[in-house]
Amino acid sequence: MKKLTIALVAHDNRKADMVEWAIHNAEFLSHHHIVCTGTTGNLVRKAMEEKGVTADIACMHSGPLGGDAEIAAMVVRKEIDLAVFLIDDLNPQPHEADIQMLLRQCRVHNVPIACNRYSADLMITSTLWDDESYVPTEPKSVSYTHLTLPTK
């Protein structure tokens, strides 16, 4: 399988879910580069080490301190292949604008994003990751970047 760069982000009330998901999928994740927001990454790394799994995990800042924005910038630069973002939909987040920015950039730049464990499981088990004949279709909105704007 080709080596992917996978972003893992989880709100405080979903961090336990993320750690459980990462441990459940540790074998898969150990073959890929993982980029996380700070606290999530440290928790995932510790849990994997306790299970004896070596993983390539890079931690950005904590989400409220700009980690979501750092990962969104990586999406724009085409450095992220897949994002798993376990969102706490039951409580307001002080950095809601950053959260929406990350979700929006994934949609705009055609990066698959899973917002629950089931969709994350479906995405990581997709055979399309290794299908060299499959080329994701760019969203039609991307064509707007090629428009010639009128000049004065």
Where in the sequence are the language-model features?
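Mid-chain, well-packed structural core segment of small domains
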Residues: 68-100
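General beta-strand structural signal in soluble alpha/beta enzymes
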Residues: 35-37, 59-61, 85, 113-117
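Conserved small/polar residues in nucleotide/adenosyl-binding loops
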Residues: 145-151
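C-terminal binding/interaction regions
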Residues: 87, 102-105, 111
